[in-house]
């Protein structure tokens, strides 16, 4: 009987790990809650609950929103760099080396093309979100857990020890 109790506990734990809350397209996941997003240039100062809405605060001048909760100081380009884009409340300053044609910042790929009059054109491509990857990974872990649970139950009921002590095991063993 102890293996069955342990197996049930294991299944409950796997179910808890495998269940992920999926928010609607117009919501963001904050902890275990799905909340409406903050406005542009604002950070989360208090997470929503079932009874209250999310509380947002604008980032002060000279900072930009970094993630959902933080305002980060804007980067200052140094003397060996050229400023490509000014810092705003939603995006950091984009700096590039004066003599290079390619550069990158985390999560964003940039390509700078110099023309004869030394103006720059930038193409920006955002990185992909990891939310779908997390959902698929959770589903995979859940399914592997269920398969292991089924295999364990079959092995337990087929064992001689279980057949001798459990009438259910004898019935189950005969049907397989």
From Swiss-Prot:
Signal peptide residues on this chain, from the entry's feature table: 1-20
Domain of life: Viruses
Major localization listed first in the record, in broad terms: membrane
Placement of TNFR-Cys repeats on the sequence: 22-56, 58-95
Summary of the function given for this chain in its UniProt record: Activates NF-kappaB in a tumor necrosis factor receptor (TNFR)-associated factor 6 (TRAF6)-dependent manner, causing the up-regulation of the chemokine CCL22.
Pfam families: TNFR_c6
Subcellular location: Membrane
SMART domains: TNFR
Official protein name in the record: Membrane glycoprotein UL144
Transmembrane segments: 134-154
Keyword check for Repeat: yes
Subunit and partners: Interacts with host TRIM23; this interaction causes auto-ubiquitination of TRAF6, leading to NF-kappaB activation.
Membrane topology reported for the UniProt record: Single-pass membrane protein
GO biological process terms held by the UniProt record: defense response to Gram-negative bacterium; defense response to Gram-positive bacterium; negative regulation of alpha-beta T cell proliferation; positive regulation of cytokine production involved in immune response; positive regulation of T cell migration; symbiont-mediated activation of host NF-kappaB cascade
InterPro entries membership: TNFR/NGFR_Cys_rich_reg, TNFRSF14/UL144_N
GO cellular component terms attached to this protein's record: membrane
Keywords: Activation of host NF-kappa-B by virus, Disulfide bond, Host-virus interaction, Membrane, Repeat, Signal, Transmembrane, Transmembrane helix
Species of the source: Human cytomegalovirus (strain Toledo)
Disulfide bonds: 23-34, 35-48, 38-56, 59-71, 74-87, 77-95
């Amino acid at each position: 009987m102890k293996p069955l109790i342990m197996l049930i506990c294991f299944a409950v734990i796997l179910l808890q790990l495998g269940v992920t809350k999926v928010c609607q397209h117009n919501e963001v996941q904050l902890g275990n809650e799905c909340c409406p997003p903050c406005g542009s240039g604002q950070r989360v100062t208090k997470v929503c609950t079932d009874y209250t809405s999310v509380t947002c605060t604008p980032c002060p001048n000279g900072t930009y929103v970094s993630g959902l909760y933080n305002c980060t100081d804007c980067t200052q380009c140094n003397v060996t760099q050229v400023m490509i884009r000014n810092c705003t409340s939603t995006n950091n300053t984009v700096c590039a080396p004066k003599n290079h044609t390619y550069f990158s910042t985390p999560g964003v790929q940039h390509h700078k093309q110099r023309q004869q009059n030394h103006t720059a054109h930038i193409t920006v491509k955002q990185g992909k979100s990891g939310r779908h990857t997390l959902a698929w990974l959770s589903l995979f872990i859940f399914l592997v857990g269920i398969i292991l649970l089924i295999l364990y139950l079959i092995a337990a009921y087929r064992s001689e020890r279980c057949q001798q002590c459990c009438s259910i095991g004898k019935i189950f063993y005969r049907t397989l």
